[in-house]
């Protein structure tokens, strides 16, 4: 497992902690108890990552090797920044020679070597600003974007799939040949047009669900490996159907 890019709090906490009732609603108390007793939350604190999401990327990379050799990385929906932390480390990015560009409409504390844009990725100016910020051609586009949930599963799925589609078209527009694209999606079916587009442009398209993604969560990740290049992609037939792991 890849080590933390920065030092972290080594104190840790014991699992099985309870939250006092106080004024919290039962549902809020259960969520808080699950959060503070989550082993991935505790590992993130111990290893210096900003969120447990770091381990989702690390687990996917452990099997699919998407970080190795990446010279420049773009991180969409970056806040609070755990994926950007990993990206900065694997690319040896520094403030003097930044090789990671990140974007989110939420605030994010600075990370050495990461150029951060506080901007909605759906803003028409966002793609060009990211291209300027990265200062070269990225080998990897990451997207952990998800629309705010409404509680209505189909609505949440459609809204997050829209973000995934926009991210995928952006990746095809900016990636270096041989590059990879990883994006969050929700279980419930991936739109055929999106899958067909990815199959035309990448050598392999699969769905993955890392162990650190909570079992009850509908979250999955769509991984497209081996970008064929823009000219070649326009003339080739689609690759095999996307597989689920």
From Swiss-Prot:
From the UniProt record, list the reaction(s) this protein catalyses.
Answer: uridine(2552) in 23S rRNA + S-adenosyl-L-methionine = 2'-O-methyluridine(2552) in 23S rRNA + S-adenosyl-L-homocysteine + H(+)
Q: Which InterPro entries match?
A: RNA_methyltr_RlmE (IPR050082), RNA_MeTrfase_FtsJ_dom (IPR002877), rRNA-MeTfrase_E (IPR015507), SAM-dependent_MTases_sf (IPR029063)
SUPFAM superfamilies in the record, alphabetically?
Answer: S-adenosyl-L-methionine-dependent methyltransferases (SSF53335)
Tell me the active site.
184
- Tell me which Gene3D superfamilies the record gives: Vaccinia Virus protein VP39
Localisation per UniProt entry: Cytoplasm
Question: Main localisation, per the record?
Answer: cytoplasm
Chain ranges passing through the membrane: none
E.C. no: 2.1.1.166
Which residue stretches does the UniProt record annotate as biased composition, category Basic residues? Answer: 11-25
Q: List the disulfide bonds.
A: none
| GO MF term (any one) | rRNA (uridine-2'-O-)-methyltransferase activity
Q: Where is this region: Disordered?
A: 1-25
Q: Which Pfam families match?
A: FtsJ (PF01728)
The protein's UniProt keywords, in alphabetical order, are: Cytoplasm, Methyltransferase, rRNA processing, S-adenosyl-L-methionine, Transferase
GO cellular component annotations, sorted alphabetically? cytoplasm
Chain sites annotated for binding S-adenosyl-L-methionine? 81, 83, 104, 120, 144
Q: Keyword Iron, does the record have it? A: no
- Purpose of the protein: Specifically methylates the uridine in position 2552 of 23S rRNA at the 2'-O position of the ribose in the fully assembled 50S ribosomal subunit.
User: Per the similarity annotation, which family is this?
Assistant: Belongs to the class I-like SAM-binding methyltransferase superfamily. RNA methyltransferase RlmE family.
Q: Which HAMAP family match?
A: RNA_methyltr_E
Indicate what this protein is called per its UniProt record.
Answer: Ribosomal RNA large subunit methyltransferase E
Q: Which organism is it from?
A: Sinorhizobium fredii (strain NBRC 101917 / NGR234)
